[in-house]
């Protein structure tokens, strides 16, 4: 899957390598996570700016809702994620990820604490959809929840 390769090459492995290198060179966990946050937040802020283009369009929520399932299938395929669709209606788009390649690989490489940084980047990226679409989340696999929940709410 090219989508998986893209996640691995563009996001997962470079960040993981940077973090592991910092740790191997004596940087403590909290400090290493801060360095990684600074770097990954740059990409998340670029994504937020891209999201603003959609967020500023008329009927942004409807456009997002009509494309979200196809986007998820293409960019977050079953080989890396297990997606449970809960709602996709005129008020809310809600899905849960029960398996996530980021969580699986950070555990496999003995740095599960790094996964929360990837999750934080969702919050930054999706904030670009405001004010028409509000992103909410109650938990992630990385912070001990049984799944990562994604809620996109249509603004009133």
Label every PLM stretch briefly:
Residues 24-28, 128-133, 155-156:
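Secondary-structure boundary elements
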Residues 40, 144-146:
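Short secondary-structure boundary/hinge segments and terminal tails
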Residues 1-6:
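N-terminal leader/targeting and assembly helices and adjacent pre-domain segments
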Residues 13, 17, 121, 145:
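Short, well-structured alpha-helical interface segments that form or flank functional binding sites
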Residues 147-154:
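C-terminal edge-of-domain segments
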Residues 84-137, 141-142:
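Short, hydrophobic/π-rich interface segment
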Residues 89, 154-155:
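Short acidic-glycine loop/turn motifs at beta-strand connectors
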Residues 10-110:
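Amphipathic interaction/junction segments at domain boundaries or subunit interfaces
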């Amino acid at each position: 899957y090219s989508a998986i390769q893209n996640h691995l090459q563009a996001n997962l492995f470079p960040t993981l390598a940077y973090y592991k290198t910092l740790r191997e060179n004596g940087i403590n966990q909290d400090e290493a996570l801060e360095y990684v946050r600074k770097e990954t937040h740059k990409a998340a802020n670029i994504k937020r700016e891209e999201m603003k283009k959609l967020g500023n369009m008329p009927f942004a929520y409807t456009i997002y809702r009509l494309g979200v399932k196809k986007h998820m299938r293409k960019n977050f395929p079953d080989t890396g994620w297990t997606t449970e669709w809960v709602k996709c209606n005129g008020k809310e788009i809600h899905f849960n990820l029960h398996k996530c390649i980021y969580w699986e690989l950070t555990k496999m490489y003995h740095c599960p604490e790094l996964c929360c940084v990837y999750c934080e980047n969702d919050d930054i990226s999706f904030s670009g959809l405001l004010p028409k679409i509000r992103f909410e989340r109650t938990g992630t696999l990385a912070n001990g929840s049984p799944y990562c929940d994604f809620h996109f709410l249509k603004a009133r």
